[in-house]
Amino acid sequence: MIRLRILEILEEQQHTKYWLYKQMELSYQNFNRMVTNETSSIRFDNLEKLSKILNCPIGDLFETIDDEEK
């Protein structure tokens, strides 16, 4: 399973979820689903925006986990 590491990256960079929410300009519902890995898809433009805002390569936004670790 692939999941987004947004919360971990925010913690590493000492930013809040609210800070990122304001930067992303998404509805809170869509933003929260993305951040909490409750979505099955994400738009490429949102990935690009995340990468720029968090100043990290797109690949760093993801991690692969075993299904048992859910």
Task: Describe each model-derived feature in a short phrase.
Residues 39-49:
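Short, basic-rich loop-to-helix N-cap that marks the start of a DNA-contacting helix
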